[in-house]
Amino acid sequence: MQIVNISAYKFVSLNDIETLRPEMRSRCEDLELKGTILLAPEGINMFLAGPRESIDGFMAWLHADTRFADIAPKESLSDNQPFKRMLVRAKKEIITMKRPLIRPEEGRAPSVRPVDLKRWLDQGHDDEGRPVVMLDTRNDFEVAVGTFDNVVEYNLTKFSEFPDVIEARKAEFEGKTVVSFCTGGIRCEKAAIHMQEVGIGHVYQLEGGILKYFEEVGGDHYRGDCFVFDYRTALNPNLEPAGPKQCFACRAVVTAEEQQSPHYVVGKSCPHCVGRHDQAAA
């Protein structure tokens, strides 16, 4: 049976999480869905997987709530269920930045559609003639799997490092158009809002993130694959599972070439961590 995988988020004020959480969990369990839903005062972030009729049933139920009526999930298909259980969690933030919460009532960050971004990258500037800077807001191990050409990235180990890094370097973006991007849109939207707040003038988020870019325009101006947080590890520009895998011992991304190493033992070690294991055992 083919499994439909969806991801979606929305920054929207939620003040009824104690009621919403059990309702969502019950609905997902009734539909035999698996995955994770995060609820916070600033919004919702969800990753779900299940049969087509179950996914459609949940989205119809969700859209009946006017706060979520415009949520449009990104989809991909797999032969297996990528999640082991169904979790609905209450959090302080739907993506952790450890800065003041997003205020949804003040509006979203400006966004650029994938087709428009491709045009900018094709022509070498935005529609007003400003140079375009592609800013990767993901963690370093995700960037290693694939990213846009000529990207700016800061070797982040966690997203909460982003504010301090960007505030120290904001002068580098003067006179340029900055397009922040991430896997599905949530981190780059929060990053874009923060950049506006610290005075960076021309900031956009990539609408729908890398996965939406793949879906609408393919892999132009992008090199490699896109890391995803489930058993597939990475998707190529055709939104198909790609070669890299994740080491369950150290969480490093293991390329197809590295998987040929004798140090790569599924569930035990990989070339990135085998030496550390040996030292720990000594």
From Swiss-Prot:
Class of the enzyme per the UniProt entry, highest EC level: oxidoreductase
Record: active site: 182 (cysteine persulfide intermediate)
Gene3D superfamilies: 3.30.70.100, Rhodanese-like domain (3.40.250.10)
Disulfide links within the chain: none
Signal peptide, first to last residue: none
S-adenosyl-L-methionine is among the record's keywords: no
The organism's place on the tree of life at top rank: Bacteria
EC number: 1.14.-.-
PROSITE patterns associated with the record: RHODANESE_3
GO MF term list: oxidoreductase activity, acting on paired donors, with incorporation or reduction of molecular oxygen
Keyword list, A-Z: Oxidoreductase, tRNA processing
One GO process term, biological-process aspect: tRNA modification
Cross-referenced HAMAP family: TrhO
PANTHER family in the cross-refs: RHODANESE-LIKE DOMAIN-CONTAINING PROTEIN 7-RELATED, THIOSULFATE SULFURTRANSFERASE/RHODANESE-LIKE DOMAIN-CONTAINING PROTEIN 2
UniProt-listed NCBIfam families: PRK05320.1
Family named by the database record: Belongs to the TrhO family.
Role of this protein: Catalyzes oxygen-dependent 5-hydroxyuridine (ho5U) modification at position 34 in tRNAs.
The protein's name in its UniProt record: tRNA uridine(34) hydroxylase
Organism: Cupriavidus pinatubonensis (strain JMP 134 / LMG 1197) (Cupriavidus necator (strain JMP 134))
Gene it is expressed from: trhO
